[in-house]
Every structure is written in C-alpha cells, then in structure tokens.
Regions:
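Active-site/ligand-binding loops adjacent to catalytic centers
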Residues: 2-81, 124-137
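Phosphate-binding loop/pocket of nucleotide- and phosphate-handling active sites
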Residues: 24-27, 87-137
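A glycine-rich, Thr/Ser-enriched phosphate-binding loop motif common to dinucleotide/cofactor-binding enzymes
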Residues: 82-86
Length: 137
C-alpha cells in the first residue's frame, strides 16, 4: 500500500519518513488537489500503521507531476482524472522509478473523484470554432 500526498501538504509522508506514529499538523498546506489537502488527519496513526504493515511507502508528488499525470490520462487513456487521481498516477510513476513497485506487478490506482468538479482548461487553449452554414453541407 502506498499513501499519496501532494508535496504542498504531506504530513503523512513526513511522519512515515521520520518513523513517527502520529503526523504533526502541516502548516501552510497548499495544493490544487483539494481532496488531499488535509493538514492533520484524524486517523493518522491508522494510515501509518496500514502502510507499514503492508510493507508499503508514503510518497509526495509535486503540482507539476500531478498536472502532467492528469493530462497524460486524458490524452492517452481518455480519462478525466481529478487532481487527486493525478497525484495517485504521479506517485505510481514515482514508485516505479524507485523500484517500490515492479513493472510486471499489478497495481490498483484509485481516482477518488472526477475531473468535472474542477475548472476546465484555459479557454485560450481550446479549439477554435468557426461559424458555418449547415445548409451548404
């Protein structure tokens, strides 16, 4: 099991890396992935215990990696991930790079919401539509 947090709010990752049983509150929490912007988890000790007992890890991913993962999932798989789901995909990539997960292993990635609840891409980057006379088709 791998716990995933945004680098701008990663109290569980910090506690896991320090070997602590409880996570200290993260001050100045900031991430586009609002669903994982949790400065102080109520069940921190349960999460840390589950990660340790599973032989897992806790990983933090930066905002750039989150957005890259969201874009890649849309472009390559046709999936509209929420930023939280992008964080999970980015962490999976990080886990592969660190050999925490084998490339031949089966992994389950959770996308806990939908990209529709977040603002769409910048309008200036969308396709340009032209008016057309449909009768002439």
């Amino acid at each position: 099991m791998i716990a995933v947090q945004a680098a701008g709010c990663a109290p569980m990752v910090r506690a896991w890396e320090a070997g602590d049983e409880f996570a200290e509150r993260w001050e100045g929490a900031a991430t586009m992935a609002t669903g994982i912007r949790v400065p102080k988890a109520v069940g921190d000790f349960l999460i840390l215990r589950a990660v340790r007992e599973s032989g897992g890890a806790a990983l933090a991913v930066d905002e750039e990696a989150i957005m890259e993962a969201v874009k890649d999932a849309a472009r390559l798989d046709g999936m509209l991930l929420c930023p939280e789901g992008g964080a999970v995909l980015a962490a999976w990539r990080q886990a592969l790079d660190r050999d925490l997960v084998g490339r031949d292993e089966r992994a389950v990635l959770f996308n806990c919401a939908n990209g529709n609840k977040y603002p769409l891409a910048n309008r200036a980057r969308r396709m340009k539509l032209a008016e057309m006379d449909a009768a002439g088709l």
